[in-house]
């Protein structure tokens, strides 16, 4: 069941005009440090803080909705929530179905991780999360693609030997490698994929998209977006 979580920004705004717009923000809740569920059962992470701040700046009441990754776009277009903020890379294929804001996380490379540095990433089995740009890339390389529903399952597949390596965003993998005590290592060269990470909206919601786009522009301009990036991505820092 999808989980609705009233944000702090929403609570602060409930005393406002009754006409204030309530916006439902859809995320996966399983892709740290972008988004995850904390010990209190609440959405947390970089995108939680970013989304709350964007809602505050736009004067919007916002709720958080968690949704499995492989249906996150269909459930946006069907109206289950109003925006996606879930570590989603901007791609031409996705842009044919939904509209993206500008990126709030700059284009960065994906990476392979395995149990040894010479893991076979061209002829072996490579794990990737289903419906991701990484899965599409693996399918195009000649390696055997093993798709999993969640990011954690892709890591588990490498640890238990089901896959020779995993391909995912480097910033997701970096803390996992650092905390593995040498069990996991980066393999080969980084792989540039996607056009950065942006928020996704229904194509009919152009005015709503613009409110968030304006907020992202303002946060880039005043340095607050860079401050959030520095806070949450300590293993692979990026900035605008």
What are these regions (language model features)?
Residues 1-20:
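Gram-negative bacterial Sec-dependent N-terminal signal peptides
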Residues 21-87:
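Extracytoplasmic small-molecule ligand-binding "clamshell" domains
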Residues 48, 64-74, 130-131, 146-160, ...:
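Short helix-initiation/N-cap motifs at beta->coil->alpha
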Residues 49-57, 116, 124-125, 129-134, ...:
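Extended ligand-binding regions for polar small-molecule ligands
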Residues 60, 89, 94-96, 100-146:
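A conserved helix-loop-strand patch within extracytoplasmic ligand-binding domains
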Residues 61, 137-153, 186, 216-240:
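Ligand-binding clefts/hinges and TM-proximal coupling segments of bilobed small-molecule sensing domains
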Residues 71, 88-97, 164-193:
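A ligand-binding cleft/hinge motif common to bilobed small-molecule-binding domains
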Residues 106-111, 174, 178-217, 235-240:
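Periplasmic-binding protein-like
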């Amino acid at each position: 069941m999808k989980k609705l979580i009233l944000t702090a920004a929403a609570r602060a705004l409930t005393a406002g005009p009754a006409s204030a717009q309530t916006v439902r923000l859809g995320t996966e809740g399983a892709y740290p440090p972008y988004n995850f569920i904390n010990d209190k059962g609440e959405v947390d992470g970089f995108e939680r803080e970013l989304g709350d701040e964007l809602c505050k700046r736009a004067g919007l009441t916002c709720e958080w909705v968690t949704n499995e990754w492989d249906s996150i776009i269909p459930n946006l277009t069907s109206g289950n929530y109003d925006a996606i903020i879930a570590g989603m890379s901007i791609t031409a294929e996705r842009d044919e179905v939904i509209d993206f804001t500008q990126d709030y996380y700059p284009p960065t490379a994906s990476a392979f991780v395995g149990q040894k540095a010479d893991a076979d990433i061209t002829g072996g089995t490579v794990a990737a999360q289903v419906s991701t740009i990484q899965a599409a890339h693996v399918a195009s390389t000649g390696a055997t693609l093993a798709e999993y529903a969640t990011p954690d399952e892709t890591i588990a597949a490498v640890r238990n030997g089901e896959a020779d390596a995993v391909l995912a965003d480097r910033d997701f993998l970096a803390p996992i490698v650092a905390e593995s005590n040498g069990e996991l290592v980066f393999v080969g060269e980084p792989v540039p994929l996607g056009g950065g990470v942006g928020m996704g909206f229904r194509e009919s919601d152009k005015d709503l998209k613009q409110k968030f786009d304006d907020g992202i522009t303002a946060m880039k301009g005043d340095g607050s977006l860079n401050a959030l990036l520095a806070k949450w991505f300590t293993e692979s820092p990026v900035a605008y």
